[in-house]
Amino acid sequence: GLPGGGAEMLVDSVRNDISPKKGEPKNWLRIMEEAQSLGLTTSATNVIGFGETIRDRVEHLNRIRDLQDSSLAQYNIGFTSFIAWPVQLETNTFGKRNRGSNKFTLGAGPTEYLRHVAISRLFLDSIEHIQASWPTMGVEIAQMALLCGADDAGSTMMEENVVSASGTSKISASEFELQKTII
């Protein structure tokens, strides 16, 4: 399959601010649809806490759901999982650039993350798996996410670049720790 990293927030106004060099949301959606049309499964991601509105989050989820519904109807394949996590503001470029700017509230804490997981599970009903993001939230919050609609704790990571580039410090968990989290 094709990993769905790079989606961040599929809303033009937010994406232009947080990652202007990554291109428009329609490009990410087009690439995912092309992969699905070729028979590849894909995953979808969502980073929250950039100062986006609830409406922006719903628009992101709706774009993913629309593509999922279309791909399932046309190709009988689509996204197999959805993974959301909060931006790690303390140590990444976006957080440093916007620290103290007061133009919007940055970040998303555990409660907001868990609420987003629950809403994602309800909204993305045709995506089989919602993954708990232990690499960004830690195993304790990931365990709570499993009670909020997530059904996948992910896996141990041998070599990981996307989440670690976001500045998180929680990317280490052993197989035993993950088993303990889900049992």
Feature roles, as predicted:
Residues 61-65, 69-183:
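Auxiliary Fe-S-binding modules of radical SAM enzymes
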Residues 1-40, 47-71, 97-108, 167-169:
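Conserved non-cysteine loop/helix-boundary elements of the Radical SAM core domain that shape
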Residues 30-42, 119-129:
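A structural motif corresponding to the C-terminal end of an alpha-helix
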Residues 4-6, 42-48, 81-86, 134:
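A cross-domain feature marking catalytic cores of carbohydrate-active enzymes
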